Every structure is written in structure tokens, then in C-alpha cells.
């Protein structure tokens, strides 16, 4: 399938996954949907519709107890002309059955709207803390944290995290005090990279990258080279891939350029044989790049 913005393996399956289909751009995604992709015994793939959802941009599967929930974020709800943002997006959800064989074009999964009014509903990040899963969702009207229903309950819990226009965000404990900081790309496809620290129950900005990062889009937050780090890539101007860490000796954040002139869209971290790697989808240079990160 083309127009893939998200792919998530179905829990407990042998290679079956869900994927967005026909999301090409904010102006060309009225026919977007989430599809079920299943490997065939003799090779190839079976592709079926799970649910048609215009402008679906990011989605995920979150576990709560023994149940699994689909959470899906539509960038907007419609438009009348190019770059029309007059119809804000929404967050949709549904309990996901363990057997997806019944779903197809004629019998689609029923979704429920759990939050409306999400202008430029772009950013998504899965959070796992103490075995519990939740999601950070970023839009022009702020950053929100969504918790799936607890076992035996039906309603989602949604918290207001930060009231700033945001494109993407991740949570990372940079300074090691046990409280995760909030790293934010702002505004929508914007040029600001900031880090907020939680004090007295609310987030306060403690760092902002001194240079504009035009069309910031790729983001990873987590361990890198054995320490908490933020990786950000941006698609215009210098088109750099950046790494941010916190220096405990100086009490200051530091930045490092990992690569230049590539224009990353997405970035993924993994460790193999004790070495740290980043895979970057460098859209502006038509390449998939593999980086081994060293000190």
C-alpha cells in the first residue's frame, strides 16, 4: 500500500500489521484509511480495510490489562481548497478485537471520537511507564496525553500537558532526576526545538536550540550511547540531523550535528551487538541512511 505514515504490528501475530494507506499529503488524503496486512503462506500479502478514516495521519495500538485499543489521529476533518485548515482534526479510538479476520471494506471497525477540535493534529508518541501505556498527541492547540480505559472501564482519560502549538513531542529524563522532560518541535512543521522541565506540576521552558530548524520533522527521544538523548532532523535550509544531551557537570544542554544536507523525515534508533544505530528516512535526498553513532 502507498501513502503509509504509520505501521504497527498486531500484538501476538506472526507478521500481521496495521498500516495507514493513501495518506499522501495534508492536501491529498481524503481517501486515507487503516488497512490490515497479513503475510500469505505462499508469499505475498493480503490487504484488507480495517476502517476508512479520511486524513488519518498517525495511529497506534495501546495495551491496557489484557485489552488492546486502537488510537487514530486525523490531521484534519476535511478541506475545500489547498492548505485549508478550517476543519480541525480529531482523535478516534476503539477496542481492538484479538481476531481481525471479520473486518473488510463492507464490515469496518467502529470508531469513537475521544477528542475534537485538534487543529493540525500532527504529532504522536507512545509512552510506556511502569508497564502502563499512553500517548502524547500534538496539535496547534497544544499537547495532550491520552490514556486508554483501565480494565473494566470504557472511557479514555485525556490530560492537557502543554498549551503551545506543537508539531511533535517526546518525554525523556535528560537530567536523571526521575522526572521526564518534554522535548517539543513547534509549531506545525516549524523551526523551534525546545525542552521543558516539569516543576510544581507544570512545564517550564529550560532550553531552546539557538538556530532555526526549518521544517523540523524527524524525532527520537531515549537512550543513545548509554545516556538520555534527543535526535531531531529537519527538512529545509541546512537539513541537518541533530543530537541533544544534558551535561550534568555544567548543568546545560548541548547539541551535536550528526549529518548535514540530508533532510530527514523520520528517524529510528536500535542497538545491535552493543552498538548504537540510527536509521533515517532522508526524504529530501531520496535515501534511507544507516548511521553508527559513536562518541
Where are the predicted features?
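Beta-propeller-forming repeat regions
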Residues: 1-295
